[in-house]
Amino acid sequence: MIIFNIDVMLARRKMSVTELSNRVGITMANISILKNGKAKAVRVETLDKICRALDCQPGDILEYREDEVE
């Protein structure tokens, strides 16, 4: 599974979710969906805007973790 580590970059940049939402042009609810791992997909355009707003690379906010076996 792919994990979005947006909180880490927000803390490093001292930026609020509200500010990120305004800069990227997506709702706070959609940012929350990304942060909580509930997103089924993300547009490359949205990822680009998030990276621009946070001044980071995609690898700084995306992490791959193997699914846990139940």
Name each model-derived stretch:
Residues 15-33:
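Short alpha-helical DNA-recognition segment
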Residues 8, 33, 40, 62-70:
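Short, charged recognition helix plus adjacent turn
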Residues 23, 41, 52-53:
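Residue cluster at the C-terminal edge of the helix-turn-helix DNA-binding motif
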Residues 10, 21, 51:
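The alpha-helix within a helix-turn-helix
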Residues 46-51, 61-62:
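Hydrophobic micro-packing sites on short alpha-helices
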Residues 1-15:
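A short, Lys/Arg-rich alpha-helix, primarily the initiator
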Residues 7, 18, 48:
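Residues within the helices of the helix-turn-helix
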